[in-house]
Amino acid sequence: MFFWYQNHVIAKLLVWLLFPFSLVFWFISVIRRRLFRLNWLKSYRSPVPVLIVGNLSVGGNGKTPATIWLVKQFQSRGIKVGVISRGYGSRAEHYPYLVKIDDNPTRSGDEPLLIAQRTGVPVCISPNRQQAIELLLAQFNCDLIISDDGLQHYKLQRDFEIVVIDGERVFGNGFVMPAGPLRELPNRLAEVDLIINNGKLTGYSNTLMLLLPKFAVNLVSGEKKLLRDFQRIPLNAIAGIGYPQRFFNMLRDFALTLEKTQSFQDHQDFDAAHFAYFSSNQPLFMTEKDAVKCRPFAQANWWYVPVEADIQGEEVERFMQVVSQQIKEKK
C-alpha cells in the first residue's frame, strides 16, 4: 500500500488506525509458528534438501530473479534442481501442476512460467507445497528443491532460508501488516542462512544483488536491440510487478525518455484494452514477467527488458558451498 513507504500526515494516521489489526496479525503469526515448532501443528519434511527464497515484506523485493540465479548456479555445479511455487494468480485445471515452457501464463502463473523458461528446470505449482515436492520427486531425480517464496509457510520444513531485501525501500515504516509491509519483524533475519540486498546494501548483510539489463527484446519478432539504441526516442512503459517504479527508474538510468508510464498491480491479467492509453506509434517497454502475458495481443513495437541477476559477496559463495556439501552427503 502507498502509505507503507511514506511519512506524511495521512500515512501516519492510517498507520495508527490499522495498528490494532497489526498487533492481532503479529500475535497470530507468532503463536502459529510456535505451534509448528512444538509439533502441535504438523509439518512436512522433504527427503531432499529444501531451500526457501522469501522475504519479510510484501511484494517487489526481487525473489524471482534471485531464484533464477540460484538455480543456474546450482546447475553449474551439477546439482539437479526442482522449483516449487504457490503459483499466485494461476488457474490450473488441477494441482499440483507441472509448468511447461510454452504454457499459458493464466494457467501457470507468470513467475513460475518465467522461471521454467529461463532455467529449463522442472517447476511445479500448488497451494500444497508437499504435493508439489512429491510430484517433482516422483517424476524427476531432483537433488534440491527451491521454493520461490514461502518463508512464512511453516507447514513445509526447510534446510536453508534466504531472505531478499529491497535495498531501496527496505522495510518501509517497519510495521507488520496491515499497518506496514512486514509479514514478520526484522529480528527474524537472525535465523536465516543468507540475506541478499537487492540494488543497495542495507546493513543487514554484505551480499548485493544487481539486476542487469543488456537489451530489449521485441515481443513479436524476437529481435534484440541494445537499450542505448532507444535513447533518442520517446518511449512508453508499463509494469505489473510488486514495485513498478524500480523498472521505470532502471530505464531512466539508461538515459531513456519515458513519455508515459503506467503501473499495474502485481500479477496483473492483461488484455489489449489495458494498452489503449498508449500511442501505437511509440515503442512500449515492459518487464519480462509482463511480456509472458502480453504476447498473444502484442504489437510490433512492444519490447520487454530481461534482466540478469548478479549476486556478489563472500557470504553467498560460502552458502553455495555449504548447500552443495549437504547435497553431496545425502546422495
Curated annotation (Swiss-Prot):
Pathway given in the UniProt record: Glycolipid biosynthesis; lipid IV(A) biosynthesis; lipid IV(A) from (3R)-3-hydroxytetradecanoyl-[acyl-carrier-protein] and UDP-N-acetyl-alpha-D-glucosamine: step 6/6
Known catalytic reactions: a lipid A disaccharide + ATP = a lipid IVA + ADP + H(+)
Keywords, ordered alphabetically: ATP-binding, Kinase, Lipid A biosynthesis, Lipid biosynthesis, Lipid metabolism, Nucleotide-binding, Transferase
Entries under SUPFAM superfamilies matching the protein: P-loop containing nucleoside triphosphate hydrolases
GO molecular function: ATP binding; tetraacyldisaccharide 4'-kinase activity
EC number: 2.7.1.130
UniProt superkingdom: Bacteria
BP-aspect Gene Ontology terms: lipid A biosynthetic process; lipopolysaccharide core region biosynthetic process
The keyword ATP-binding is assigned to this record: yes
InterPro entries on file: LpxK, P-loop_NTPase
One Pfam family recorded for the sequence: LpxK
GO cellular component terms, semicolon-separated: plasma membrane
Keyword Acetylation: no
Binding site for ATP: 57-64
Family listed: Belongs to the LpxK family.
PANTHER family: TETRAACYLDISACCHARIDE 4'-KINASE, TETRAACYLDISACCHARIDE 4'-KINASE, MITOCHONDRIAL-RELATED
Described function: Transfers the gamma-phosphate of ATP to the 4'-position of a tetraacyldisaccharide 1-phosphate intermediate (termed DS-1-P) to form tetraacyldisaccharide 1,4'-bis-phosphate (lipid IVA).
HAMAP family: LpxK
Protein name (record): Tetraacyldisaccharide 4'-kinase
Gene (name only): lpxK
